[in-house]
Design a protein with these regions (language model features):
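Flexible, gly/pro- and Lys/Arg-enriched active-site loops
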Residues: 94-96, 102-104, 123, 136-151, ...
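Histidine-centered catalytic micro-motifs
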Residues: 10-13, 112, 116, 126-137
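Active-site-proximal beta-strand elements of phosphoester/diester hydrolases
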Residues: 3-11, 109-116, 149-151
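Short aromatic-enriched loop/helix-cap "lid" or pocket-rim segments at secondary-structure transitions
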Residues: 15-20, 124-125, 140-143, 166
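Receiver (REC) domain switch-region micro-motif
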Residues: 56, 128, 154
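Extended catalytic core of nucleotide-activated donor transferases of GT-like folds
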Residues: 65-67, 89-91, 111-122
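Single conserved hydrophobic/aromatic residue that forms the stacking wall/gate
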Residues: 152-170
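Core catalytic region of metal-dependent phosphoesterases/phosphodiesterases
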Residues: 2-8, 12-106
């Protein structure tokens, strides 16, 4: 039975993301200095984990430049793109590599998006799995009477471990 994977903010081809830091200002968000090395390591890790028939929801910011789109054909899986703020190319550019393009996706009581939902909207869905924030957290507003959290799972490819939600196979 195929597995379902969620990944976000791969930023293939993005030299600047190699300089992103965690909130401590000391630890790099990604271990690579060279974007080509980063891209190759992420492709290798992706294909070691994701099989051709697995479903992958990419939660946005897949590539930073048009040249990096050519990497997509090398990635295993039946891919769906939830568009992010850096996914700026024409739909046809992405349709060559993704079965479906979406603004968001609702699955098993969860909403998948690139940017986090406003906390007042969470009651409708229960769980929002999103990208976009990298090492940052969703701010908490005490007026809502609950704590909202955002955990950093951006580019789990760096540690060669994807987050698998096989239980949600569709």
């Amino acid at each position: 039975m195929p597995s379902v994977f969620l990944v976000s903010d791969t930023h293939f081809g993005h030299a600047g993301v190699c300089r992103f830091m965690r909130n401590d200002g000391v630890t790099k968000l990604r271990p690579w200095d060279d974007p080509n090395e980063m891209d190759e390591a992420m492709v290798k890790a992706w294909n070691e984990r994701v099989k051709p028939n697995d479903k992958v929801y990419h939660l946005g910011d897949v590539v930073i430049n048009r040249k990096a789109l050519s990497i997509m054909h090398r990635l295993n899986g039946d891919k769906v793109l939830i568009r992010g703020n850096h996914d700026i190319f024409k739909d046809d550019d992405y349709r060559q590599h993704f079965r479906e393009l979406r603004a968001y996706h609702v699955m098993n009581g969860m909403i998948l998006s690139h940017i986090p939902l406003h906390p007042e909207s969470l009651g409708r869905f229960g769980v929002n799995i999103h990208g976009h924030l990298h090492a940052n957290r969703v701010m908490t507003n005490v007026r809502w009477g609950k704590t909202e959290r955002s955990e950093e799972h951006t580019s789990e490819l760096q540690s060669h471990s994807f987050i698998s939600y096989a239980v949600f196979c569709l």
